[in-house]
Amino acid sequence: METATLVAIFLSGLLVSFTGYALYTAFGQPSQQLRDPFEEHGD
């Protein structure tokens, strides 16, 4: 394969991995530990 193809595949995989990790952090098991500043506000 050409270098440009390998770089494109690597960057695409990196983007997909980062997106998956962000979704897991937002909606998965670790999301229970996140605080919600809107619920903490008393108004």
From Swiss-Prot:
Chloroplast in keyword set: yes
Signal peptide: none
Membrane disposition: Single-pass membrane protein
Keyword Magnesium (UniProt): no
GO biological process: photosynthesis
Organism superkingdom: Eukaryota
Matches recorded under Pfam families: PsbN
Residues spanning the membrane: 7-29
Entry keywords, A to Z: Chloroplast, Membrane, Plastid, Thylakoid, Transmembrane, Transmembrane helix
Gene Ontology CC annotation, any one: chloroplast thylakoid membrane
Subcellular location: Plastid, Chloroplast thylakoid membrane
InterPro entries registered for this protein in UniProt: PSII_PsbN
Task of the protein: May play a role in photosystem I and II biogenesis.
Family affiliation: Belongs to the PsbN family.
Protein name as it appears in the record: Protein PsbN
Species: Draba nemorosa
